[in-house]
């Protein structure tokens, strides 16, 4: 990337070599705050303004999608109206209608997939410690918690459908890595944040939601010689298809 304060230097290089800049790409993150989006659009259009040949602005990063109940999903109508006014004002001022590009991948597919694992082991470090659930899954399918403390919804599916009391657990993966923790503190992969779940037992199925984006594609597949997990698509008619 290029720091925005270096725009004048870039313009000099463009002029020196007779180049034309057709597209400006800025990375604004994946937030849901309309005010942040508006500020990012304004700053990005200021860059476009400096390159007369530019006709496309790509706001990289995409839309925030809430995976957890306390997370806010981007309101496309709210941010869209503000962005529209900024682009229209730019067109009136410069005579240039700018094409907007946004990367919507996560927004579309994040909550379309889930990991279905099995509880392999249970252990405890005593009254002053934690109760642990160990799965036959982990970094090999989802590195987001280990990398940046990402949060995912989780559920225990008791065998035989029985009802059990809730209990607080630290959920761990099966990799030989101290960082293979699936319940880190939010935004802190080094921290631990117990999750309240139905009481687990060895052999129970365990679901991890919100895994449709940046999980399979970003995972440590085949690490520790664990084979790559199959990916199954449930079609609209209920039929199952093995994708991978």
Positions of the model-derived regions?
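Short, surface-exposed, charge-dense and proline/glycine-enriched linear segments
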Residues: 49-60, 83-93, 123-138, 239-241
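A cross-family glycoside hydrolase active-site/sugar-binding cleft signature
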Residues: 25-27, 58-62, 101-105, 136
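Charged (often Lys/Glu-rich) extended helix/loop segments that serve as interaction or gating elements
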Residues: 97-244
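Short connector loops at secondary-structure junctions
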Residues: 22-28, 60-63, 168, 172-178
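Feature marks short, surface-exposed loop/turn motifs that line or immediately flank catalytic pockets
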Residues: 30, 63-65, 108, 141
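Active-site-proximal beta-alpha core segment in soluble small-molecule metabolic enzymes
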Residues: 1-56, 65, 71, 77-81, ...
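Conserved "cap/hinge" positions at secondary-structure junctions
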Residues: 67-68, 210
């Amino acid at each position: 990337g290029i720091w925005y304060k270096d725009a004048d230097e870039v313009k000099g290089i463009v002029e020196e070599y007779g180049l034309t800049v057709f597209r400006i790409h800025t990375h604004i993150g994946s937030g849901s705050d309309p005010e942040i989006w508006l500020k990012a659009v304004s700053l990005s259009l200021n860059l476009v303004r400096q390159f007369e040949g530019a006709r496309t602005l790509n706001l990289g990063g995409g839309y925030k999608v809430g995976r957890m109940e306390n997370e806010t999903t981007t309101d496309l109508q709210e941010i869209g109206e503000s962005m529209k006014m900024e682009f229209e004002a730019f067109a009136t001022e410069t005579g240039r209608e700018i094409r907007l590009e946004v990367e919507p991948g996560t927004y579309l597919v994040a909550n379309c997939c889930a990991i279905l694992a099995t509880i392999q082991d249970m252990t405890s470090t005593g009254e002053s410690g934690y109760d642990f659930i160990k799965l036959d899954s982990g970094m090999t399918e989802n590195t987001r918690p280990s990398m940046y403390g990402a949060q995912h919804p989780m559920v225990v599916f008791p065998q035989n459908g029985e009802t059990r009391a809730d209990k607080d657990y630290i959920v761990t993966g099966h990799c030989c890595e101290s960082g293979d923790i699936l319940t880190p503190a939010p935004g802190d992969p080094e921290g631990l944040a117990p999750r309240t779940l139905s009481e687990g037992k060895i052999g129970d199925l365990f679901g991890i939601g919100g895994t449709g984006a940046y999980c399979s594609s970003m995972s440590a597949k085949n690490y520790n010689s664990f084979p790559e997990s199959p990916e199954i698509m449930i079609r609209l008619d209920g039929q199952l298809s093995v994708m991978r």
